[in-house]
Regions:
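Polytopic transmembrane helical bundles with strong interfacial aromatic enrichment
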Residues: 1-136
């Protein structure tokens, strides 16, 4: 089960890296439309949370230390924060126009994305240590 846990954390890290790629694809798509960020939304709202839940289940079954289980579920919590950032940013927007306050809030979306990447990387390192039998 430790190999499954490691594999899921590796897939989670890959999904997070792809999330940044999909964000860039959406940002530079011409013409801009609601579907420009379709892959970014799908990956962020479905794939990353699913992999986080599966990695957490695998970690628990593999009986890894509690810190590693916490790292496995942390991306799901941070995805919830991502959604809240967008909702709050929209609340500070003025119809179709983005206000300076909304831009500050939306900027937190990118910073939180970096936090998700850091947690996914720590998760992968913890799974690798577990697999190799090295002390955490």
């Amino acid at each position: 089960m430790q190999k499954v846990y490691f594999g899921l954390t590796a897939l989670l890290q890959l999904a997070v890296v792809l999330q940044f790629y999909f964000a860039a694809v959406g940002a530079f798509s011409k013409p801009q439309s609601d579907s420009s960020y379709g892959l970014h939304s799908l990956n962020g709202m479905m794939i990353i949370p699913l992999l986080s839940i599966l990695a957490t289940i695998a970690a628990a079954i593999a009986r890894v230390p509690g810190r590693a289980i916490g790292l496995a579920i942390a991306p799901l919590g941070l995805v919830v924060v991502q959604v809240l950032i967008i909702v709050i940013g929209k609340a500070f927007s003025d119809g179709d126009d983005t206000t300076p306050a909304a831009l500050v809030i939306y900027g937190l979306h990118a910073i939180n994305g970096l936090a998700i990447m850091a947690v996914a990387g720590a998760n992968l390192r913890a799974a690798r240590q577990q697999l190799s039998g090295a002390p955490a």
